[in-house]
Amino acid sequence: MEVKEKIKLLAYLYYSNDCEELNNYTDSLSKNEVFEIYTAYRIGEIIKNGLNSGKVIKNFNRTKYFLNQREYYKYCVHEKEIRNELTTKLECYIYNLHFFVEWF
């Protein structure tokens, strides 16, 4: 499943108020899938805030590689917290992920 489809499913589960299904889905995500969603969230945040200073983020995989270099260690150290954020701060995540989905 493509990362955009995972994001749409997360948003659907969140807004359907099916907490049990949402928790089951987020618990079943692999470490790489969570990192992909986290990367998409960070890209959405960059697009939202205009921090790309005129540089257009055109290629998700290239950007993911760039973020991997900068943030993979941070992600590995905080993976459990980031995974928990998928359920506790999901509204904020979805807001930023919306920018990612619109962009790509």
Regions found by a protein language model. Name each.
Residues 1-104:
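A charge-rich, low-complexity, intrinsically flexible signal that marks solvent-exposed coils, linkers
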